[in-house]
Regions:
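Hydrophobic small-molecule pocket/channel-lining residues, especially in calycin-type beta-barrels
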Residues: 1-137
Length: 137
């Protein structure tokens, strides 16, 4: 398994990614977050999670592991819709955007990530054009 990790994980960003398009490099590392579901309703819930990001594939992509509830919280706070998921974001020099594949048990989603002002907007590639917006960064 050690060789797999050695060829997957990279020390940093590839020079093939222009700095202006380095949208996700700021997230490399380990993060704790609070997931708020059904905000403002009687069903509102708050769940602690983890999000871990690393450069991969010679620094041309960023992969993350999304864990919600967090590994620690999963033991005492079972959630029936818990996620232990991963996403790979690979820079596409032809579109100057990021091709993204998010997958978890039971499904996968393809998105395209671009900067819009001071936000990162990830548009789902399907007939619905759903957007996942990363803001307040």
């Amino acid at each position: 398994m050690g060789e797999f990790i050695n060829v997957l994980v990279s020390k940093g960003k590839s020079n093939l990614i222009p700095e202006k398009d380095n949208l996700y490099g700021q997230f490399v590392g380990e993060w704790d977050f609070e997931w708020v579901d059904n905000q403002g309703t009687t069903g509102e819930r708050h769940v602690q999670g983890e999000w871990i990001f690393a450069w991969v594939l010679e620094g041309t992509a960023i992969q993350d592991v999304f864990i919600c509830p967090s590994r620690k919280a999963r033991i005492k706070d079972y959630q029936p819709d818990a996620a232990y998921a991963t996403a790979v974001r690979m820079y596409n020099p032809n579109t100057e955007a990021w091709d993204i594949l998010y997958t978890e048990l039971g499904g996968a989603t393809q998105l395209e990530g671009k900067r819009e002002g001071n936000r990162i907007v990830q548009t789902e590639i399907n007939e619905k054009n759903i957007q996942w917006v990363l803001s307040l960064i």
